[in-house]
């Protein structure tokens, strides 16, 4: 999917180098850890790196510091450099919407929440009640449909409740936050993966213009999904990871911006941490015909859409109504 994005939207997606510093006591890293990480890098190349024509490199001490001179010199041993990709997510979404509208006749409307579902005499969904905001009187009206897709992210259970009458509690929201600090505090030439002390996670340190983004967290969230917030504990978590790997100290006073979001992870009884939950997506179809897509991530958006459309086609054909009326 990453290769497809690079091919289909080269103006929005570009290859991004990632550096994984290896630290050790007294400048020595355990041979087992070094060997395991090397195997992981080759595994990454075989499953994805070769598709974009980029393979990992092993860098020595001096080569590593050339990419990020603020790394802890007393603990740094060497590093691995591998390649992934980055995308302008907002422009990608707008581009897809423009293509759907201009090339395929889709009607695109934001600030138009779905407040209800209508069903025919057999209990099959045949309309969505919407309430456009900003029209003055917030008038409701019904959009007649042959199929309805519920792709509401962390709000999918709210839509399913309109359909099923009860909340299925199928989503486990996971909060992720990023902080922004001045680039001069970090001086990384590429994206860098740094470990979180006392945790089994790592975070990314990504340069962007005159700033550096640090993130993300991955924690359970039970607050209002309309307004996730970055807390002081979130900021401290990311700063501790950054300061563990660099010389000098970045403080809360250096943080010039934060943002927070929620991942609509599919709930699983087998995992205690959101970080351990699968990012795989799931497509469901209710008895009334509502098609719901949950889980997933931006990289696999095309595959998610393809699977969803396949389910929509099955729904329409099962009702024997066709796509022409």
Question: What would you call each of these model-derived segments?
Answer:
Residues 99, 158-161, 166-213, 219-325:
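C-terminal catalytic lobe of FAD-dependent flavoproteins
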Residues 45-47, 65-104, 125-129, 143, ...:
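Helix-loop-beta segment of a Rossmann-like dinucleotide-binding subdomain
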């Amino acid at each position: 999917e990453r290769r497809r994005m690079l091919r289909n939207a080269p103006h929005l997606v570009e290859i991004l180098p990632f550096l994984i510093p290896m630290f050790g006591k007294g400048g020595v890293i355990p041979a087992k850890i070094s060997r395991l990480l090397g195997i992981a890098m080759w595994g990454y190349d075989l499953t994805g790196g070769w598709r974009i024509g980029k393979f990992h490199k092993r860098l020595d001490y001096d080569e590593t510091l050339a990419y990020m001179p603020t790394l802890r010199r007393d603990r740094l041993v060497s590093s691995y450099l591998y390649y992934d990709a980055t995308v302008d997510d907002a422009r990608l979404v707008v581009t897809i919407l423009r293509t759907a509208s201009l090339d395929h006749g889709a009607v695109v409307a934001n600030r138009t929440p779905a407040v209800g579902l209508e069903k025919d005499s057999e209990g099959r969904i045949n309309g969505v009640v919407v309430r456009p905001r900003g029209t003055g009187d917030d008038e409701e009206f019904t959009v007649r449909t042959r199929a309805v897709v519920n792709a509401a992210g962390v709000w999918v259970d709210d839509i399913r409740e309109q359909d099923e009458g009860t909340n299925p509690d199928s989503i486990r929201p996971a909060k992720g936050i990023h902080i922004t600090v001045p680039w001069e505090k970090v001086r990384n030439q590429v994206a860098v993966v740094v470990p979180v002390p006392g945790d089994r996670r790592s975070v990314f340190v990504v340069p962007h213009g005159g700033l550096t983004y640090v993130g993300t967290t991955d924690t359970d969230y039970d607050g209002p999904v309309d307004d996730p917030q970055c807390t002081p504990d979130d900021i401290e978590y990311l700063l501790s990871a950054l300061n563990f790997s660099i010389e000098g100290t970045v403080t809360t006073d250096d943080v010039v911006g934060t943002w927070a979001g929620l991942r609509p992870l599919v709930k699983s009884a087998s995992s205690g941490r959101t970080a351990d939950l699968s990012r795989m997506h799931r497509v469901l179809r209710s008895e009334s015909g509502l098609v719901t897509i949950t889980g997933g991530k931006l990289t696999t958006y095309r595959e998610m859409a393809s699977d969803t459309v396949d389910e929509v086609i099955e729904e329409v054909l099962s009702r024997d109504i066709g796509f022409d009326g």
